[in-house]
Regions:
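Donor-nucleotide binding loops and adjacent catalytic segments primarily
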Residues: 123-130, 134-214, 246-250, 254-258, ...
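Glycosyltransferases and closely related glycan-assembly transferases
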Residues: 35-47, 53-69, 82-87
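Conserved nucleotide-sugar phosphate-binding/catalytic loop shared by glycosyltransferases and other
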Residues: 1-26, 177-179, 263-265
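A short, well-ordered alpha-helix in the C-terminal region of glycosyltransferases
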Residues: 130, 284-298
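Acidic donor-binding loop of glycosyltransferase active sites
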Residues: 43-45, 209-224, 231-232
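C-terminal alpha-helical cap of glycosyltransferases
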Residues: 297-313
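Active-site-proximal region of nucleotide-activated glycan assembly enzymes
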Residues: 2-3, 62-123, 134
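An amphipathic, basic-hydrophobic alpha-helix
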Residues: 13-45
């Protein structure tokens, strides 16, 4: 294993907040601790994946002359990475046209690393169908709101669960902890074997393999995995993220006819209807699959590792 060091730091609130009064003290504390970590650990390279947590350490590393890399996962970078761009050696990106935000000469297109089990999921379709007890000849919809679930997505699915039964659609529904009991009760009442809810799905490789249509938030890593899978996707960006970067991520796919998008605020009314219409449109399914597959990057982890090794030679 490896040691985890925490910093007393948090993001700066865009609107007025008393929490902002603590920000200068948190920043100074984190810079001092980062300096101590670098002095003690003596790194040959420092990599930051963005956000306020990596800012102080990358800043101190660059001041000490330690080679530093930012891995920007989103299509729209946050303030921290924009500020760090001036001092780091290279910036790994997963989207095109990032020279709008960063110095072009520092950009390296690597994509985002995805989980090994997802890379090995393509030949597990039958295993996935059996595992989730799905009807063989029905389209399977996988709904994933992230590990904590997503209230609006859950409410949309729950309020229109009868549509899945009516339209003979299989459903694999990850709810998160807070919606687990309500979803279980609804699934029990509808009483269809191909419609199942789960607090958390450990076997995501099997869920992805079994799915024909996927409903997901638009986080950077999730999108990278969806590009690899090459299946029709309906994205519901979370509104509760800095810089609204999930909407930017989703829009970049929509612009390439690679995904459909439903705004979070509209999802209670429009999400299930969007799923239903997509399930009935084979041509659109094929177009979305074909286009999103063009965006996959299988070897992102290797690209980042190769760059890292070059910088420490």
């Amino acid at each position: 294993g490896y040691k985890i060091e925490g910093l007393w730091i948090s993001g700066f609130q865009r609107s007025f907040s008393r929490k902002n009064l603590l920000f200068p003290f948190k920043l100074i504390s984190s810079l001092i601790k980062s300096r101590k970590i670098i002095r003690r650990f003596q790194p040959d390279l420092v990599i930051g994946t963005g956000g306020f947590a990596s800012g102080p350490l990358l800043y101190e590393a660059s001041r000490k002359g330690v080679p530093s890399v930012v891995q920007e996962q989103n299509s729209y970078p946050g303030i921290t990475n924009k500020l760090l761009a001036k001092s780091v050696q290279k910036i790994c990106v997963a989207y095109e046209n990032m020279e709008r935000f960063f110095p072009k000469e520092k950009l390296i297109f690597t994509g985002n690393p995805i989980r090994k089990e997802i890379l090995n999921s393509s030949n597990k379709r039958e295993e996935g169908k059996n595992f989730f007890k799905l009807h063989n000849r029905r389209i399977t919809v996988l709904v994933v709101g992230g590990s904590l679930g997503a209230k609006t997505i859950n409410e949309s699915i729950n309020n229109h669960l009868g549509e899945f039964k009516k339209n003979k659609l299989n459903l694999i529904w990850q709810t998160g902890v807070s919606y687990e009991n309500q979803a279980k009760e609804s699934v029990k009442n509808i009483n269809v074997s191909g419609i199942q809810s789960y607090k958390f799905i450990k076997e995501m490789d099997l869920a992805y393999a079994a799915a024909d249509i996927i409903v997901s938030r638009a986080g950077a890593i999730a999108i990278s995995e969806l590009c690899f899978l090459g299946k029709p996707v309906v994205l519901v960006p979370s509104p509760n993220v800095a810089e609204d970067h999930q909407t930017q991520n989703a829009q970049s796919l929509v612009n390439k006819n690679s995904a459909l998008m439903v705004k979070d605020v509209e999802s209670r009314l429009k999400l299930v209807e969007k799923i239903k219409s997509l399930s009935e449109n084979k041509d659109l399914q094929e177009e979305l699959s074909r286009n999103i597959k063009k965006l996959e990057v299988k070897d992102a982890a290797d690209r980042i590792a190769d760059l890292s090794l070059e910088l420490v030679k």
